[in-house]
Amino acid sequence: MAQPATPRTMAEKVWADHVVAHGTGEGAAREPDLIYIDLHLVHEVTSPQAFDGLRLANRPVRRPDLTIATEDHNVPTVDIDKPIADPVSRTQVETLRRNCAEFGIRLHPMGDAEQGIVHIIGPQLGLTQPGMTVVCGDSHTSTHGAFGALAMGIGTSEVEHVLATQTLPLRPFRTMAVNVDGELPPGVSAKDIILAVIAKIGTGGGQGHVIEYRGSAIESLSMEGRMTICNMSIEAGARAGMVAPDDTTFEFLRGRPHAPTGADWDAAVEAWRQLRTDPGAEFDTEVHLDAAELSPFVTWGTNPGQGVPLSGAVPDPELIVDEGERQAAEKALTYMGLQAGTAMRDVAVDTVFVGSCTNGRIEDLRVVADVLRGRRVADGIRMLVVPGSMRVRAQAESEGLDRIFIDAGAEWRQAGCSMCLGMNPDQLSPGQRCASTSNRNFEGRQGKGGRTHLVSPAVAAATAVRGTLSSPADLSAVPAR
């Protein structure tokens, strides 16, 4: 097949491969393109009205074989064999079960061996593959872009449109390259990279763009790390985030339940290798970071862009030139109960949460276990370790990680979104402060009046041991036995 004369970015290639019909018109008056959707992920919160719309129009689900559902946002992470106590949560879960049964959609319910957070079960089952278009009624669908897929969150009306037609009307996005080159210092993770990126470009810096993460530091990451980075693309305002598929991607997918096999596998890998951005392709925007200059990162405010290195201090709003940003910082410090100039390492927490679609994978749990091994959670600190899926939970238990967590004084939970958001029993009380491996630190995100600091799994574990925001480098060595 002849290559187009104009070099294309990866996002442009995937888009072009999925255009069912081009929109007509020019400029701002141009109609959207109609894009085919390869994989539709569904959960209990954003789908009920979409299914109701199908019923009212007497429409079936167009491709139930390309639609998969799970229960994650509202489910409890303890006593999962008992009825859900909260009536709203219980109704949403029961409604999803009825809808999936009626419309013939595969569902992984609470307690199922493959149940878990929607953005963790897709990749672990091999459903998410390079070059796909993936949608879900959830902001963090961008996670799947780590495989070289064009993945984005959609609203409830769009969920209904995809259920009915397996297509979505979309306008082309702008493209942004975030280049992270060099070698990461010891103790610096994918979570630190993405928090630094968002702090650099702001929560609106990627608005209207698909971000492609590039450079030697990105290429050195595992698939789990790449998923962490793409997961938080939306926190920079981007529509999606992507990483070019490579041998790391292919080895992750090889042998998974829905991955191609035999000759189909060989053909798929050959096609996937062609997705990489062409030499000479131009991005609308480019951003550069030197990996060697990065360090463990934490947030101090109430949006993911309000972050500083752990070695730094709470910023002084008076030094912020932009009036809007200054006012936002003042408001954030009031809500967070922090004083300008306070060293981040002096900020004490009540709770530590490890989990979410950002950092609830087996690699994340191994990092936490390495820090906690032979140590204890500090007095007065509550630590929740919540696997992102039942498969992750089973793997962790087969490796004995659960015993390390429990022996250290942490709570080992069932799979679910848990304390990432205040839609289930795992919530902060007003005024409580949490070091969290999740993706959002908005006011009340983890419970009304709760205060959230976004951190990496390693920082979360060290914080649990010391009781203040810390990295493993701050801990005393474990005595030899």
Swiss-Prot record:
Disulphide linkage map: none
Pathway assigned in UniProt: Amino-acid biosynthesis; L-leucine biosynthesis; L-leucine from 3-methyl-2-oxobutanoate: step 2/4
Polar residues bias (residue ranges): 429-441
Manner of cofactor binding, per the entry note: Binds 1 [4Fe-4S] cluster per subunit.
GO MF terms, alphabetically ordered: 3-isopropylmalate dehydratase activity; 4 iron, 4 sulfur cluster binding; metal ion binding
Sections of the chain in a coiled coil: none
Cofactor(s) required for function per UniProt: [4Fe-4S] cluster
Signal peptide extent: none
The protein's Enzyme Commission number: 4.2.1.33
GO annotation, biological process: L-leucine biosynthetic process
InterPro entries linked: 3-IsopropMal_deHydase_lsu, Acnase/IPM_dHydase_lsu_aba_1/3, Acoase/IPM_deHydtase_lsu_aba, Aconitase_4Fe-4S_BS, Aconitase_4Fe-4S_dom, IPM_dehydratase_rel_enz, IPMI_cat
Catalysed conversion reaction: (2R,3S)-3-isopropylmalate = (2S)-2-isopropylmalate
Swiss-Prot/TrEMBL keywords: 4Fe-4S, Amino-acid biosynthesis, Branched-chain amino acid biosynthesis, Iron, Iron-sulfur, Leucine biosynthesis, Lyase, Metal-binding
Binding-site residues, [4Fe-4S] cluster: C357, C417, C420
Keyword Ion transport: no
NCBIfam families noted in UniProt: leuC, PRK05478.1, PRK12466.1
Assembly and binders: Heterodimer of LeuC and LeuD.
Function: Catalyzes the isomerization between 2-isopropylmalate and 3-isopropylmalate, via the formation of 2-isopropylmaleate.
Family label: Belongs to the aconitase/IPM isomerase family. LeuC type 1 subfamily.
The protein's name in its UniProt record: 3-isopropylmalate dehydratase large subunit
Gene label: leuC
